[in-house]
């Protein structure tokens, strides 16, 4: 076969590949949400409070320990479960109990959840409990208007000075 025919065949193969690639880059049409829906993303990491408080060892307790283990303050590593609730218009949209990861159950619990909701004006209530006793440690209520096809992100920051808690980004 002659050299020009090889180049022509190779060019046609590349052109055919480009046409197929171009077709599948735009077709079939895909929509990630129905036309009248918006998306709520709940995403954050949070290390809960310790299950047991730190305590100081007495001199008698320290004397019983090996010399290399004599640390006055003892802090158990295990953390509490994180309970997260998200309500929309008075109805529970999401509820989860997150167990702390790690061998000692001392890691930060992580959450990532996509929740499709109808577009429009809604009242959201986000709650988080990160200690064993008592009710929810953090509660945030917000009236938000969600446009169709838009994404709202709900984040959580416990270390924000002045206003720790949930952050709604619309």
Where are these regions (language model features)?
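Short loop/turn and low-complexity linker motifs enriched in small/turn-promoting residues
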Residues: 2-170
């Amino acid at each position: 076969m002659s050299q020009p025919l090889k180049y022509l065949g190779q060019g046609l193969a590349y052109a055919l590949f480009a046409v197929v690639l171009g077709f599948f880059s735009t077709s079939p049409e895909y929509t990630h949400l129905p036309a009248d829906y918006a998306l709520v993303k709940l995403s954050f990491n949070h290390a809960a409070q310790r299950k047991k408080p730190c305590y100081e060892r007495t001199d008698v307790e320290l004397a019983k320990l090996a010399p290399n283990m004599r640390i006055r303050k003892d802090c158990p590593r295990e953390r509490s479960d994180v309970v997260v609730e998200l309500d929309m218009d008075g109805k529970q949209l999401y509820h989860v109990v997150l167990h702390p990861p790690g061998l000692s159950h001392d890691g930060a619990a992580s959450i990532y959840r996509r929740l499709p909701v109808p577009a429009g004006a809604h009242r959201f209530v986000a709650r988080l409990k990160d200690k064993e006793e008592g009710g929810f440690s953090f509660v945030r209520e917000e009236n938000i208007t969600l446009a169709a096809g838009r994404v709202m992100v709900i984040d959580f920051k416990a270390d924000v000075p002045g206003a720790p808690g949930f952050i709604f980004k619309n």
